[in-house]
Amino acid sequence: MGQKIHPYGYRVGITQPHSARWFANTYQYPQYVFEDFLLRQSLFKNLPVENLPRKRTEDKSETKLVQIKIERLIRNTIKIKLYVTSPENASELFEHEALTKSPKKDFGTTNSNKRNLQTNLESKKDRNTLRLNIQKRLLNKKLLQLQILKLQNMQSKLVTMKNLLDGSQNTNKKVFSSSVFVQKNETETIVNNYPFYLNNIAINYSIGKTLIEGIKDCLNMNLDGKKKVKYLFYFLQLKKQLSKTLLYQLDVYQKVEKQKLVNFTGLNKSEEQISAFQNTINLRLFKLKALSLKWTNHSRHLTNVLVSIQSKLTLELETLVSKLDQNKTNLNQKCATLINILKFKYMLRKNNFNKLELFVLNQKIEEIKLKWFQSLTIAGTVQAETDSQSDFYSSKKILLELNMISCEKQKMLTLLTKFKFSLNFYNTHLEKTKRIILAGLFLLSKFGWKKEIFNGLNTFLSQSVLIIKKLETHLGKNYKILQERIIVKINHMTILESTIKQNLNLLQILKIAQDHNTNRDKIKVSQLYKNLFKVFYLTSLSSTPAFHETLTNKTFLYDLVSESLDKYALLISQKVINLNSSLICYSEEKTTQIPVYNDKFLNILTREYLSNLIRLFKNDSINYYKSKALYQFSLALLNQRYKLNKIIEMKIKNLLLQIKPEEKTKNTFLVSIRDLNISLKSNTLFIKQLETWLTLLKKKLTENTATNRYLLQARIHKINCYLKKIIPVKITENNLVSTIEKNFIFVNYNILKQKLLAELLQMQQTIILAKKEEWEKEESLSFPPSTSFFTKTNISIGNLNQTLQILQNRILDLQGRFNQENQQKTAGKTVNTDLSPILQVENKTNVSKTLQLKTTLQQLLKTNYENSFIVLQTRRQVYNSIINRLGGHRKFGKSRAGEKENIWKNPYETAEYLDFKLKKVNNSTDTNSLTTLLETIKQKIYERKPIKLMYTRKQKFLAKKTIKKKLKHFLVLMALKNNYTNLSSLKNIYDVKTFAKLCENLTNLQTMPKVSVIELVKVHQPKQYAVCLANFVVENLEKRFSFRSTMKRASEQAMSTANVKGIKIQISGRLNGAEIARTEWLRDGVVPLQTLRANIDYSYKTAKTIYGILGVKVWLFKDTPANMNS
């Protein structure tokens, strides 16, 4: 890389890379140097240069220029590489209209420039209109989104009202879940979770069917009238539930079909296909509607029948009440009638009851049963008559045991109370004696002079005081000991009672599951459900309905039950497993299928269980007291797991101590130890999961929702205030851009406001539901809450349902429109052929960051190209070379030049007048003629070349190259002569009239500079570049810093990077204002300037000081080849 003096007086280094030298001539170098100089000068002037080290105040995300590399391709196309820090924010630098100001022209603009200006103005207008249209579309889309959010918030408010109006918690849950379901685009969720819904419906349907079959068998048997009415009532209720499930299923099918139609119309299909598909779906919908109408009528009929049966049951209840009033002597009959009354009440008012009322009613039934059995034992009526009734009497015995335990409990309590009364009695008497002793002591003090009379009294009083003290201490100790022991015994009894109750319920369930062949046990559905209800109540965790749903959805529960069991056994085992009280494990032998209790009933709590808990926990319907119960239950579980860990560790230690050297025993011990290790690992994993779950629950319990609510309200208030300020009352219609901008601001802030309102409504829903449940708890004993609430409000649930349906339809329509607009946008991106050229230009401007920079640099080169002296010289030389190549002459006289310009035609126009028909025929007939011609031409060329030039390998290669070129030229001429019909199309290649114009076009192609690409390369470490270090040294020298300190600092900065192996800095000039100029240099590390392979980065800069110019040179030796991206 040598240096040349520029004609304008600048010293410029030739920056032409080696790749350009293969096709560029030497006379083009001055032009390249001049262009490089212009580009570098403009870029370094207008872009901020990287300077090290950066100050603390400076923003490190700012884009700064490190280095420029200019590469040239064929026909003077320029590629510029800009090495920049943080190129992500580079678009801010290139937003200016022009980086460089072109010099002013004294002469006026030409016609071509005027036309260009007109076209630019037209294109700008088109762009503005296009931008306005795009902004309008976006605004419409945002408005749709705002409408959807508003409607969803309205819907959530109405849903909360409905939840308050509904009586039971189950309806609350259903409505609440449905509202959430609607908010998430109901149809899309149904289509996505289509198999899941079908599975749930199928499970419910199968359970209902099996129960109906069992009750049908029961009705066919010879039973009493009362029992038949009871079973009919159950049968009709189940039928009604089944019809509801079927109607829901039909509704799901309809929604799915509608969604299919919407999706099919969205695709790019023909009208015939769409119409055919529409017809098929319409037929399906018609059938589904007919079925739904049929089932609705059926459900109405069932409700009417149920009302009539209910009236009959009420009459029977009245008769039983009258019987109870009449019966005053027989206690057994009285208890039986009381149980029947309570059962009828339970049946009739099951749907309207609160959970607490149901529990109280069940407890009353149990108490009456206990009294009844007690009376039976006193009478001596309980006797085992047959083997079939043995189980029944065993259950009675268990009940008697329970009664005995409760009696003993009562006795203990009475003992404690009696002792308490006796203690109080003794205390009162002791106080009286104390008063008498005090009176005696008072007398002694008064009549102390008569010692003979009161001598014995003194000793008596002292003895009595000591006795009273002993009595008090003994009584206190006895009471404490008795109280502790009795309380401990009572606690043991209560635990025993609860375990016996649970076992009894589970035994009854297992009895029905085991004896599935007998008809009696198969039919006792009511018994089964009572027992299940008791077990369900005993377990604290299973009280949450969402947990029950999550477990029933799992399919692995069905695998635990063997295939040979009946439908009822499967249902019962599923229920028992879901309740998580104990796990039924059947023996491995297929012949004997006996249920066995598994002690490790907590094995059901797997990882999936915890994930389901977390999903349940996210649900808003979960309340504070429920989460508290969950927390307590999980804490107990964790303690159990810790104990289990300790037990396993102890077992492993014992086994290790018991291992013997014998092979037989050793293997068994090793296997058992391995199994225990596996169980220990699984247990530790489960403990970790439980701990995470407990932390989540603790957060839920401790978090304060009130603060979040207040924050949301404050944010909404701020948004309202801002909107009132920013939007004026009157908007000007002339300025469209400003109006659209204001509308955008208004809509965006309103969308944000609606989202915040949705969050606030969700919080309020949870609070309202929690308060409702508390209120129900408080007032459940006095009167049912649902009736009292309905009396206060005039709103009906029917009207609410209608309004919710209307809102839902409206939301679905708006969401469909919104989705269609999104689909159109995606389709517009894929299809590029329909776009106009203006839109294509708009897209390009969005994609490329450096388009504006490229255009400004191109204009700069164009203006300097027209006026510079160096470009004219290179242009003249290129022009002359083209003329010589095409066979023209450089200098002509006036007459000859005019003749040349008038006579000259395209080289292919002369071929039209020649007759090539004979040649064409000869070439087509003789296939070997072309090969022979080529061989002869080759021989002629070889003969022309001297023999001396054919010695070396290189000379042979060059000779072959020239031969190939000449043969190609010959073949082209042959092809033109043979295909004389295509000569007219070849005329358009050179669309010029004169020879001079053709030469000008070719010179423009070769010499006119064109900026093709501007590539931005990210620089991670600017310390690795010599340019940055040189800039740093120059800046410090200009600020009058000492040159040695600046050199040291620059070398430290460079050597701190791993890539740099060595640095050399040289400063020459009047250093520190000395009269004689000198050079100072500093070297750190290795800088091998003589080796060609060494990767050395060099830069030269000048510092302009008061005493003159100082030259700064920096050499950097890098370990690896230059890689700007590293």
UniProtKB/Swiss-Prot annotation:
UniProt name for this protein: Small ribosomal subunit protein uS3c
PANTHER family cross-referenced by the UniProt entry: 30S/40S RIBOSOMAL PROTEIN S3, SMALL RIBOSOMAL SUBUNIT PROTEIN US3C
Places the protein is found: Plastid, Chloroplast
Alphabetic keyword roster: Chloroplast, Plastid, Ribonucleoprotein, Ribosomal protein
Keyword Ribosomal protein part of the UniProt annotation: yes
Family label: Belongs to the universal ribosomal protein uS3 family.
Gene3D superfamilies per the UniProt record, alphabetical: 3.30.300.20, Ribosomal protein S3, C-terminal domain
Organism: Stigeoclonium helveticum (Green alga)
Region entry Insert, spans: 89-881, 943-1013
Ribosomal protein found in the keyword field: yes
One cellular component (GO) term of this entry: chloroplast
HAMAP family: Ribosomal_uS3_B
Example GO BP: translation
GO molecular function, a single term: RNA binding
Subunit structure: Part of the 30S ribosomal subunit.
InterPro entries xrefs: KH_dom-like_a/b, KH_sf_prok-type, Ribosomal_S3_C_sf, Ribosomal_uS3_bac-typ, Ribosomal_uS3_C, Ribosomal_uS3_CS
Pfam families hit by this protein: Ribosomal_S3_C (PF00189)
